[in-house]
């Protein structure tokens, strides 16, 4: 069955984007370097098939937008089977007692900003050619009260997260930086 759709100006295609299409990420995100610098909590099968299908039918992807993605800060976890998990930090950075810093130890954004604005600030604060990485810092009390990322609040133990390196513990900022 053939169906037609007509539009006066544009069609918005909601097909999940292209979080796991390395070539398109490289083309659309100037800061992405080799295209592998982004981790997405989106399904790994979400490789932009819908966009490519639309392009074969004559569709055009708007590539002049200042932001071609919905950015979200994530952390990477290692699962028991050795595969990697991607943990989105939608609200973690805005929890009481949490601050975010770049590798140089400097705060770069208001942690309460939207996750999209937060990641834009993180990208802007990174030095050219440097991996875009930030760290969420909190004290023991905040961690146990609110949790952080894949670390649940008290009474769940912290051992696993400390042993895998997902959490780092130190009594000074210098210890945390090691």
Residues covered by each model-derived region:
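Glycine-rich loop(s) and the adjacent beta-strand/alpha-helix scaffold that form part
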Residues: 6-77
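A structured beta-alpha segment of the ubiquitous adenosine-cofactor-binding alpha/beta core
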Residues: 1-5
